[in-house]
Amino acid sequence: MEETLTYSYNIPSVLQKADGQDELRLAKYSEIQKPSDAPCFFIGQVKQPFMMARCLLALANVVKASFNLSPAQLALLKDPIVSAGYERVRFEGFSHCAGVYARLDILPEGLNGDFLQSGTTNVDFNQPMLSALAGIRNNETVTLSVGQKAVGLHLENQQIIERKVPLPVKWIKGLSSVQVYLAQSENSFTLSKIQAQQLFRSLPKGQVRTDYYLVMRGNMQQFSPVKSASAICIGGLHRLRLLEPLLPFIDKLQVFAHPQMQSTTWQLYMGEMRFSLSLSRDCWRGFSGEGATLDALNEGIDEGWLAIFNEQAQANQTINPAFFSSPGGAWLSKTDTLSAQLAAMGLLGFDLEEGTYFYRQLPFKLSRILGLNPRLKGAEKLIVDEKVAIVSQQAGRTEARVAGSGVQHTVIIDASGERCTCEWFSKYQGERGPCKHVLAVKKYLLMK
C-alpha cells in the first residue's frame, strides 16, 4: 500500500464572488505550528479566473497522468498542493509516476487582495471538479470552497462537493528533488507564441521510447533524434503533450535545462500567470526516486540554524542566501549548503524566472521529512552497526570498506568523484545520487 501523510483543517477555504470578482481564501494545517487567529492565508480577487481554470485543468491532467504505471495503480490518484505567500499563490502537483512536475504561479499583478498569513494546503481535483472547471466562462459567477473535509465548487446552476485526500509521501520526496534540479537549470531557449505552436506541431505521434533533442536549425527550434551542439536532451518527449491545451493562451515559452541533462523545464507565460512543466530524465524515473538531495541531507542541519531561517522565511517568504553571509549573519559560512539542505527537505521551491527560492511551509515535523529516504536511513544504520572502516586517508583521497550482505564494498572518494563497488553504483554511475555506502562513509568522516 502506498504510504501517505494525512492532515486536516480547523476551518474551510473558500473561493467566492464579491463585487463581480473572485476572492480566494485558503485555510491551513500544521503539526509544528499552533493555529493562529487568521481565518485563511489569502483574501483577494483573481483577475484572470478563466485562465486560472484552464491552468488548473492542465495541472490536473498532470496529476492524473502516469507514464510507467498500470491502470490499477492509476486508480490511486492524488491531488495538488497550494502555497500562499510573498504576494503569490502557487499550485503544484506531480504525475502519479512522479516523473512530471507542474506548477502554476499566480503573480501579485494577477491578484487583488490581502495575504493574512503564509502557508501551504492541499486541494482536490476529482472528476466532478474537473468538469465544473471546464465549464467556467469569463463572466460566470463562481465560488470555490476548500475546507477541512470537503472541496466545493459552486456555479450558477450546480454545486460540486469533493472529499479531501491524503498527501502522498512520494510527493514530499519529489518536491525536494525537483527543486535541486531547478536551482541548477539554465535558460536555453525562448520561443514566441507562434514559434512554440510550430514546435509542438512537430511532436512525434504516440509514445516516444528514445531520446530526442531540442536543436536550432537556422532560426527555428526543432525536435530531432540526432544530438548536435548546444542541443538539450529530452527523455519521454511525448509527455510535453500535457502543455498543448495551454499553447493558444501563451505570450511566450522558455525552456530551461539541467547542466547534466537530468531534467528540462518548460515555462509558459500568460499575462500575470506562469505555468511550468518539469520532466525527469526518463519516463520510468520519478523525481521522488532521485538522489539529488542526499548529500545535502547527509550533512545534517543544526536546529539553531533552522530556527533563524524560519523566522526570516516566514517574514519574507523568499530566500536570499546573501542575507546569511551579511554582517548580521556572518556566523553561517556554507550558505549554498544550507539552501540545498532546506530545499532537500521540501521547505524551499525554486522560481526560475526570478532566480530565487520561495518558502513552502510543509506541515510536518523535520524528523518525519528526514526519515523519508531509505538510502539515508540505510547509511545511518551502517554507521550504528559499525560496518564502516576507513582504510586510508591522505592527499585528498579516502578509501573505505563497508560491510554488505556477505560482501565487503570498497568506497573511494577523491578529487575525481565518488565510487563504490556495489551494484547500485555500477548500474547508475552516480547519476541518481550516491549509494548508501558512499553516504555512510561521508557521514562517518563528518562525525570524526
Question: Model-found features: residue ranges?
Answer:
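Long, low-complexity, compositionally biased intrinsically disordered regions
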Residues: M1-K448
